[in-house]
Design a protein with these regions (language model features):
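Catalytic core of nucleotide-sugar-dependent glycosyltransferases
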Residues: 9-18, 23-48
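Short, solvent-exposed amphipathic alpha-helical segments in soluble enzyme
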Residues: 68-72, 123-126
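Flexible, charged surface loops at secondary-structure boundaries
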Residues: 45-49, 69, 99-104
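Short glycine-/acidic-enriched loop or helix-start segments at secondary-structure transitions
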Residues: 16, 63-66, 118-121
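Glycine-rich adenosine-cofactor-binding loop
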Residues: 48-68, 76
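Conserved beta-strand elements of the Class I
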Residues: 5, 51-55, 108
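Phosphate-bearing ligand-interacting subdomains
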Residues: 81-139
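Short, solvent-exposed loop/turn segments at secondary-structure junctions
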Residues: 11-12, 19-20, 57-61, 81-82, ...
Length: 139
């Protein structure tokens, strides 16, 4: 039979460190990660679609709004009354209730608040939207 044993020293030290490449190399920048996500969204969920919507006009959402290039969302959804009715980077801000139905659009969600995913799912699911079919979280 085989026997398990304990090695004398760690074989791999997997900790957050300022020396990690992902912490110091510009190739790992948030902008580059968003560019990668945009590319794969274009190859998957957004492929063949003439329009989509973005949920989120906060700090995370604005970063996405600045960087959409070939495709831009038709609108951006937010729940802040000071933002709704305005334009951010040329894109109109709407209330969630103004979204087209689940079979009419796709929604990319760019909200970084810790409780946002569950709150947004709680709004989307009862209205017939299904994650990955009708919407996807980006952040």
């Amino acid at each position: 039979g085989k026997q398990f044993g304990k090695v004398a020293e760690p074989l791999l030290d997997w900790t957050e460190s300022p020396k990690r490449l992902s912490m110091r190399d510009p190739r790992y920048s948030p902008e580059n990660f968003r560019a990668l996500k945009r590319y794969y969204l274009g190859q998957s969920h957004l492929r063949g679609r003439s329009a989509f919507h973005q949920w989120g006009a906060g700090e995370v959402g604005k970063a996405w709004l600045r960087e959409w290039d070939v495709m831009k969302p038709s609108s951006v959804v937010d729940i802040n009354p000071r933002k709704v009715g305005r334009r951010i980077h040329g894109i109109p801000v709407i209330w969630p209730d103004a979204l087209p139905g689940p079979d009419e659009t796709f929604i990319v969600i760019a909200v970084g608040a810790p409780t946002a995913r569950e709150e947004i799912r709680a709004w989307m699911n009862p209205r017939g939207y299904r994650e990955l079919r009708d919407f996807v979280f980006l952040a």
